[in-house]
Design a protein with these regions (language model features):
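Alpha-helix C-cap/termination motif
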Residues: 46, 74-77, 126
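Intrinsically disordered, low-complexity and often Lys/Arg-enriched segments
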Residues: 1-2, 140
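Domain-level recognition of nuclease-like catalytic cores that cleave nucleotide substrates
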Residues: 10-25, 88-140
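Catalytic cores of nucleic-acid endonucleases
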Residues: 4-6, 31-38, 58-104
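Active-site metal-binding core of divalent-cation-utilizing nuclease and nuclease-like domains
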Residues: 2, 9-47
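Conserved catalytic cores of phosphodiester-cleaving nucleases, focusing on short active-site segments
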Residues: 43-45, 49-59
């Protein structure tokens, strides 16, 4: 287990996190044209101006078009590396991943949680200014 955990919520003591803390974006639906709305980002970290976004899916299905557009733009314009993973959020077992890098979307590939941990560790070294790994930018 990691030495540090920023998530300090105890559902047994404080109630269901989703009920108590997850915003209902419905109040903002009429603010945007068409079907545009806020999306939740499952995880994001910034190191030296570089962004790593994590999107969790329960299975390796088609990424919604709106998210594809957003992730392509973010990866092209904001030095963001977006990784979508699929798996079991309760057990944290990841089975597939795809990435968005430099405006392009990859395809779902089989991958393990351990491999994603390794990918994120390499990305952090790259973001901190270490030797860039081509594999990190390509999501492999």
């Amino acid at each position: 287990m990691p030495k540090f955990s920023p998530f300090r919520w105890d559902c047994d003591k404080q109630g269901c996190f989703n009920t108590k803390c997850r915003p209902d974006f419905g109040v903002f639906y009429d603010c945007f044209p068409g079907k545009g709305s806020f999306t939740d980002i499952d995880g994001i970290i910034e190191i030296n101006g570089k962004l790593l976004l994590l999107e969790w899916k329960s299975k390796p299905d088609t990424i919604p078009v709106g998210q594809q557009i957003m992730y392509k733009h973010l990866s092209r314009k904001c030095d963001a590396f977006v990784v979508c993973v699929s798996g079991d959020a309760e057990t944290m077992q990841i089975d597939h991943a795809l990435s968005f890098s430099k405006g392009h979307m990859g395809r779902w590939i089989p991958i393990s949680t351990e491999q994603v941990v390794e990918l994120f560790t390499k990305w952090a070294a790259f973001a901190k200014g270490g030797k860039e790994s081509r594999n990190v930018r390509q999501g492999q």
